Amino acid sequence: MAPQMSQKEADIAMMLAAGCHLGTKNVDFQMERYVWKRRADGIHIINLGRTWDKLMLAARIIVACENPQDVICQAARPYGQRAVLKFAQYTGAKAIAGRHTPGTYTNQKDAIFAEPRVLIVTDPRTDAQPISETAYVNLPTIAFCDTDSPLKNVDVAIPANNKAKHSIGCLYYLLARMVLQMRGTVSAANPWDVMVDLFFYRDPEELEAKEEEAAAAAAAPAESAGYNAVADAAYGAESWDEQKPAEAFPTGGFAPAAGNWSEAPAPTGWDAQQGGDFGSGFGAMPPQGY
């Protein structure tokens, strides 16, 4: 029997399955410390042991905030928007999925002005605007950084693949679970009853196509049942197989006539004459030589 894996080993195995260790062909000089090795095709492999340690550090920072609403997580990349919303749902943080409005953290006259205590971003490149704004207000920033990501104004860099949908979903799932375990909401002895699949990005067009197929499959039996009900009402509930075929000839023979044919009443019409010479009923014929 194989020995049971520890929590760290199980998390690293999950990150390996999600592809969190796959970097890019380019490496930023500040991200070299997190690179384990370089493959033959040029892809750099990220050390997931360092990734897990940084996830624990980020979870401690988030738990230190007394009010969960003081934590804002952002994702301008489409693959990270669902993961951000799910993270906010389970941890109580605020989520900004989509385009960032400039001045959200610096313009006090803005209607959506916010003063969070911690900011979490999915990609330092696509989320460069909120990171630059946090530098003006001394806001701690946590970012998922790939091997080519710039670390300017990033306080806690979590090295991982931030371009794949499965990798982003897995990272936010692990971070949310760590936060809940440190708060005491989820027990470390028992596994979290939320599946990691809920954090993965889903294509809206693919979901719409699946819903249409399911609706069509559900409507087909209903239409067939309705047609059968109309047919039964019009032609009877009996099936065609239950109907007995009509007999070609009566099996009991023909019944005898009620009486003699000669006893029938004599006709009274113009064709009532019977027998005799032709024309006898038209009077005397003229002589032949007339």
Swiss-Prot record:
Keyword Secreted appears in the UniProt entry: no
Assigned GO CC terms: cytosolic small ribosomal subunit
SUPFAM superfamilies: Ribosomal protein S2 (SSF52313)
Chain positions covered by the region annotation Disordered: 266-290
Keyword Hydrolase: no
Cellular compartment(s): Cytoplasm
Top-rank taxon: Eukaryota
Single annotated GO MF: structural constituent of ribosome
A Pfam family assignment: 40S_SA_C
PROSITE patterns named among the record's database cross-references: RIBOSOMAL_S2_2
Self-association and partners: Component of the small ribosomal subunit. Mature ribosomes consist of a small (40S) and a large (60S) subunit. The 40S subunit contains about 33 different proteins and 1 molecule of RNA (18S). The 60S subunit contains about 49 different proteins and 3 molecules of RNA (25S, 5.8S and 5S). Interacts with ribosomal protein S21.
Role according to the record: Required for the assembly and/or stability of the 40S ribosomal subunit. Required for the processing of the 20S rRNA-precursor to mature 18S rRNA in a late step of the maturation of 40S ribosomal subunits.
HAMAP family in the record: Ribosomal_S2_euk
Sequence similarity: Belongs to the universal ribosomal protein uS2 family.
Protein name: Small ribosomal subunit protein uS2
Annotated organism of origin: Ostreococcus lucimarinus (strain CCE9901)
